Amino acid sequence: MTTASQTNAAQAPAASGGPGAPKTARGARTRARILKAAEHTFGTLGYHRAGISDITRAAGVAQGTFYTYFAGKEEILRELVRDMGHQVRAHLAAEILDTDNRLEAEERGLRAFLQYLYENPSLYRVLQEAQFVDEAIYRDYYEAFGKGYVRMLANATRKGEIRPGNNEVRVWALMGMSNFLGLRYALWEQDVSFDEIVETLSD
């Protein structure tokens, strides 16, 4: 019942490096700092209002340093969405790692997803910006979740934990449910506890 559980089979994306991928640990840290600054800047100002100078100012680096790692604003948005997606999937995979069955994984995954979104509200804001800059960026984010999720439901089917059926349809339905629960209860109004939401859906 959750976007969260999609995570397990997802693999870490290799950083694509614009003009130059980081070759040292220091370079990797600088690149990560620029990405984090872009997350804050796009989430606050929006993609079109934000400039490279806003990102570099937030990151505390020179504009020349930005172009060492990224060709421009669209590329850093693409890399940011990719990086954020990996972080979410890795976080949720860890949360459901020791679950005993599909239902428990769904419950823990949904709770973890809602909590993650509550703590990282810029995730949805950046995604919405990406949708109107380059739909492929937006689509890739969800398809990466979906592929891993389908594999997990297929595994649960083989174990007899869920009935055979079209797992791709199930996955997109569950992802949609989690997406809107996140909007309503983790971003817009936090007036229902996440435990209550999970219990309601599991009833």
Residue ranges and their predicted role:
Residues 1-19, 102, 115-119, 147-158, ...:
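C-terminal peripheral helix-coil segments that are non-catalytic and often amphipathic
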Residues 26, 30-38, 55, 76, ...:
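Generic hydrophobic, amphipathic alpha-helix propensity
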Residues 27-30, 167-174, 194-198:
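Short amphipathic alpha-helix in the helical subdomain of ABC transporter nucleotide-binding domains
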Residues 33, 41-75, 79:
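Helix-turn-helix
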Residues 44-48, 99, 120, 159:
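Short coil/turn segments at alpha/beta junctions that flank glycine-rich nucleotide-binding fingerprints
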Residues 70, 129-133:
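Short helix-capping/turn signature of helix-turn-helix
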Residues 79, 90-119, 171-174:
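Hydrophobic alpha-helical connector segments
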Residues 86-89, 134-161, 168-173, 180, ...:
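Amphipathic alpha-helical packing segments from all-alpha helical-bundle domains
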